[in-house]
Structures are given as structure tokens and as C-alpha cells.
């Protein structure tokens, strides 16, 4: 099926749709998303809304940012996302890229997006740790691509 997004018109297969039952904080009214890869922005990917073409969030693999990144998914979240196989789980961190000032980009390592790729279910979880912040300057890290 074709969808209009901020990144242009894209073709999304049914198995590429990710449902966020409670939305994403700040976008609670939106439930259907997909992850889009653009060659020009790698390693940054895009979590695009399939319900509001103006919403697309830049995301990145947190282990590219911090190779020692640690995440513990609660039993409650495992149950909610119906995770049976941890190998089928994707984790992304949301980036904030200030308009006109990409050098000030921050990454949210405290509240990653967790997706059960097998079931197409996603959720932004908040890690129970003080180790990570909601706004880490991306420039503080050396990339581990």
C-alpha cells in the first residue's frame, strides 16, 4: 500500500507496519508506523507515521552511538509486546535534530523504541536507570558503525 509521508510517497507492505497500541509520547493519537531507510541519511533511519504524513522521527541503533549500551526490558513490556524471541526485537533511539543546527543533535538513550519485529508491535519504554539521559549530545560519541 502507498502512503504519503514527510519523506515522500512510500510503498509499505502489511508486514512492515508497526502498531504502537498507546502511541508514542507526544503522538499518543498515532498508532501505525513504519521504519524507513534512506541511503542519504544512514545510519539514521526514520520512524514514519502512516496516519499523519507530517510525523517522521529520526532514529538510530543505540549500539552505533554507544557500543556498551545496555537495555533491560521489563516483564510487563515483554508481555505487552508479546516478545517470545529476543532475536526478533529491534531497539532504536530517537534523535532530536535542531533545525539549521545539526551539530546540536541529541539522542534519547533513556527512552528507546522497542519493536517486536515478528508481531509488528512497538513501544517507547523508559529505562529504570540514571545511566542514560533523554538528551545526550550526539557529538559526545564516536560512532561504531
Swiss-Prot record:
Disulfide bond positions: none
Keywords: Bacterial flagellum biogenesis, Chaperone, Cytoplasm, Translation regulation
UniProt-listed Pfam families: FliW (PF02623)
Any one GO BP annotation for this protein: bacterial-type flagellum assembly
Subcellular location: Cytoplasm
Highest taxon of the lineage: Bacteria
A cellular component annotation (GO) from this entry: cytoplasm
InterPro entries tied to this protein: Flagellar_assembly_factor_FliW (IPR003775), Flagellar_assmbl_FliW_dom_sf (IPR024046)
Quaternary structure note: Interacts with translational regulator CsrA and flagellin(s).
Summary of the function given for this chain in its UniProt record: Acts as an anti-CsrA protein, binds CsrA and prevents it from repressing translation of its target genes, one of which is flagellin. Binds to flagellin and participates in the assembly of the flagellum.
Family: Belongs to the FliW family.
Name listed for the protein in its UniProt record: Flagellar assembly factor FliW
Native source species: Thermosipho africanus (strain TCF52B)
Amino acid at each position: 500500500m502507498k502512503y504519503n509521508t514527510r519523506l515522500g510517497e512510500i510503498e509499505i507492505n502489511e508486514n512492515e507496519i508497526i502498531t504502537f497500541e498507546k502511541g508514542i509520547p507526544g503522538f499518543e493519537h498515532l498508532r501505525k508506523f513504519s521504519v524507513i531507510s534512506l541511503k542519504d541519511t544512514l545510519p539514521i533511519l526514520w520512524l514514519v507515521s502512516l496516519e499523519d504524513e507530517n510525523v517522521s522521527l529520526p532514529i538510530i541503533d543505540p549500539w552505533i552511538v554507544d557500543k556498551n549500551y545496555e537495555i533491560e526490558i521489563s516483564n510487563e513490556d515483554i508481555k505487552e509486546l508479546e516478545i517470545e524471541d529476543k532475536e526478533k526485537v529491534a531497539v532504536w533511539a530517537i534523535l532530536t535534530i535542531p533545525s539549521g543546527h545539526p551539530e546540536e543533535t541529541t539522542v534519547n538513550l533513556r527512552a528507546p523504541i522497542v519493536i517486536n519485529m515478528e508481531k509488528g508491535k512497538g513501544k517507547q519504554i523508559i529505562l529504570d536507570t540514571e545511566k542514560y539521559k533523554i538528551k545526550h549530545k550526539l557529538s559526545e560519541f564516536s560512532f561504531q558503525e
